[in-house]
C-alpha cells in the first residue's frame, strides 16, 4: 500500500491515467519528432509555394498598373496628336483661303475658280494628313495594347492574338 501511495505521490500524471512515465516520454519524443519532420517536409515547402505565389500576384498587379498608366499615356498622346493634326489642317485651310482672297482681287472670274480648287485641295490634303496621322496612331496604339496584354498575361502572343487585339483596340478608338 505504501508503494502504491509513494508511486502516486511521485507521479503527478496518475489522475490523468498515466501510470508509467516511459510510454509518456516515448510518446512525447515521437510527437516532437513528428512536429519537426512535418515542419521541414510539409509546412516549409507549402509556405515557400504560397510566398512565391503571393510575389507573382504582386508582380502581376504591378504590371497591370503599369500597363494602365501606359495606356492612359498613349490615349493622351493620341488626343494631343489629333488636336495638333486638326490645327495644322485648319492652318492650311486658312492659308488657302487667304491665297484665294488675294487671287480674287487680282482676277475676279478666274481667281474665283482657282480659289475653290485650292481650298478643295487643301481640305483634301488636310483630311489625308489627318487620316494618315490617325492610322499611324491606331497602329501604334494597337501595338502598345498588344504589348500591354502580353505583359499582363505573362505569355507571348501569337500573330493571330496580336491581330485580334489590334482590331479590338482600333475599333475602341473609332467608337
From Swiss-Prot:
Membrane topology type: Single-pass membrane protein
Subunit and interaction comment: F-type ATPases have 2 components, F(1) - the catalytic core - and F(0) - the membrane proton channel. F(1) has five subunits: alpha(3), beta(3), gamma(1), delta(1), epsilon(1). F(0) has three main subunits: a(1), b(2) and c(10-14). The alpha and beta chains form an alternating ring which encloses part of the gamma chain. F(1) is attached to F(0) by a central stalk formed by the gamma and epsilon chains, while a peripheral stalk is formed by the delta and b chains.
Superkingdom of origin organism: Bacteria
Keyword hit for Transport: yes
Origin organism lineage: Bacteria, Pseudomonadati, Verrucomicrobiota, Verrucomicrobiia, Verrucomicrobiales
Family, per entry: Belongs to the ATPase B chain family.
Coiled coil (residue ranges): none
Pfam family, one: ATP-synt_B
Keywords in alphabetical order: ATP synthesis, Cell inner membrane, Cell membrane, CF(0), Hydrogen ion transport, Ion transport, Membrane, Transmembrane, Transmembrane helix, Transport
UniProt protein name: ATP synthase subunit b
Function, in words: F(1)F(0) ATP synthase produces ATP from ADP in the presence of a proton or sodium gradient. F-type ATPases consist of two structural domains, F(1) containing the extramembraneous catalytic core and F(0) containing the membrane proton channel, linked together by a central stalk and a peripheral stalk. During catalysis, ATP synthesis in the catalytic domain of F(1) is coupled via a rotary mechanism of the central stalk subunits to proton translocation.
UniProt-recorded Gene Ontology molecular function terms: proton-transporting ATP synthase activity, rotational mechanism; proton-transporting ATPase activity, rotational mechanism
GO cellular component terms, semicolon-separated: plasma membrane; proton-transporting ATP synthase complex
Localization terms from the record: Cell inner membrane
Residues passing through the membrane, by range: 18-38
